């Protein structure tokens, strides 16, 4: 077999198919199922099998290797019915219905190129499988050569591979999914009707007690705040109330009593702190009201224009005792006293300045009106200064 013979056969597949379906070949089919084509070397079994091998491998070595062997094997197949019976064991039965003829094959140059063959339609495959024998070996190698190298072409109406039909199915109009059923069973709070809203617990009417009932309840409450069941039942019979109402009244009465007790304790604590804070102020005010007359003012009391009641009431009167003031120096001693005391006698300094600047002063002024509330900070600072001076004087006198 050579390449020219293969090309000439592949160029005329229609003629071979016509010869296969002709009445002559059908009448001959009953005698020999292996002779589908007219006899001759061109359409013989040797030629077809050798051509199939040549198409499968496409080289001269394979054609030369399998040519002789196929000729030896094809000879007994064409001869007798005994060989036909032994060969029928391995061949499928011919199909009863004959499908329509397959479309014409592509040109010869497409067979020589890799990847030119495509997957044939189902009808052509059935025809090749059912024709049996050498007819099946005619075009199967061409289709099987590139069947696994590319993606198969699917018709447009076929479903995509790997997808489940349940995901592609369209929901019916009346059908509901599991989520829809769950949402339908649980009503939303906005869809509640008036009857459902009125199903809540009804508010109990407020119990109004008469004066007699309150008096009896208060009597028992004065005896005990926690009456037992028997006492509550007896009280309920006397007051014409239920035992539950009596129990609720005692609970409320105990809460009211605890609230009053708490409020009373707070008032007691508040009054205690207020009295403890106000008592020292009163004693200090009484001390300020007592005006102590120093000796240097008493000696010059008649000649001095400054009355004794105007002397500032300093809380530390000992500042004047260790220093002896000579008589007749009232103004100088007052100025010295003001300069020594400094900020401690700020109120007295202002009043003394006004007294010395004025020509005459009415003696109707008293010490309480002239002396305001002394500043605590300034008085403490002045006291510390005086104590420091006393300490330094004592140390110098001892040395």
From Swiss-Prot:
Residues annotated to bind DNA: 202-261
UniProt key word Transport: no
Modification type Phosphoserine: residues: 188
Motif OAR boundaries: 379-392
Region named Disordered: 68-133, 171-206
Family to which the UniProt record says this protein belongs: Belongs to the paired homeobox family.
Function field: Transcription factor involved in skull and limb development.
Quaternary assembly: Binds DNA.
Stated name of the protein: Homeobox protein aristaless-like 4
Organism: Mus musculus
């Amino acid at each position: 077999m050579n390449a020219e013979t293969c090309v000439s056969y592949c160029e005329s597949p229609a003629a071979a198919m016509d010869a296969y379906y002709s009445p002559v070949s059908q009448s001959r089919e009953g005698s020999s199922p292996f002779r589908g084509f007219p006899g001759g070397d061109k359409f013989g079994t040797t030629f077809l099998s050798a051509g199939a091998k040549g198409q499968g491998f496409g080289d001269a070595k394979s054609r030369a290797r399998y040519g002789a062997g196929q000729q030896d094997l094809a000879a007994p197949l064409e001869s007798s019915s005994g060989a036909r019976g032994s060969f029928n064991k391995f061949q499928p039965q011919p199909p009863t219905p004959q499908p329509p003829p397959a479309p014409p094959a592509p040109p010869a140059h497409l067979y020589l190129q890799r990847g030119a063959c495509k997957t044939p339609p189902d009808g052509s495959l059935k025809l090749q499988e059912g024709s049996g024998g050498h007819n099946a070996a005619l075009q199967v190698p061409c289709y099987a050569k590139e069947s696994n190298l590319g993606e198969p072409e699917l018709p447009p109406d076929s479903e995509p591979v790997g997808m489940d039909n349940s995901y592609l199915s369209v929901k019916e109009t009346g059908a509901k999914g599991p989520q829809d059923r769950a949402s339908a069973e649980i009503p939303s709070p906005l869809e509640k009707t008036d009857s459902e809203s009125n199903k809540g617990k009804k508010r109990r009417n407020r119990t109004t007690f008469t004066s007699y009932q309150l008096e009896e309840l208060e009597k028992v409450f004065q005896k005990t705040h926690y009456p037992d069941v028997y006492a509550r039942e007896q009280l309920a019979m006397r007051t014409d109330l239920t035992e539950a109402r009596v129990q609720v009244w005692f609970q409320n009465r105990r809460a009211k009593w605890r609230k009053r007790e708490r409020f009373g304790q707070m008032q007691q604590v508040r009054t205690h702190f207020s009295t403890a804070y106000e008592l020292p102020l009163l004693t200090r005010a009484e001390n300020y009201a007592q005006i102590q007359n120093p000796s240097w003012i008493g000696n010059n009391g008649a000649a001095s224009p400054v009355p004794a009641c105007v002397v500032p009431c300093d809380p530390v009167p000992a500042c004047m005792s260790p220093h002896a003031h000579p008589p007749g120096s009232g103004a100088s001693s007052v100025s010295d006293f003001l300069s020594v005391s400094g900020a401690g006698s700020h109120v007295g300094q202002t009043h003394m300045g006004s007294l010395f600047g004025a020509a005459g002063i009415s003696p109707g002024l008293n010490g309480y009106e002239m002396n305001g509330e002394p500043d605590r900070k300034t008085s403490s600072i002045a006291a510390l200064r005086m104590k420091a001076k006393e300490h330094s004087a004592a140390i110098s006198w001892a040395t």
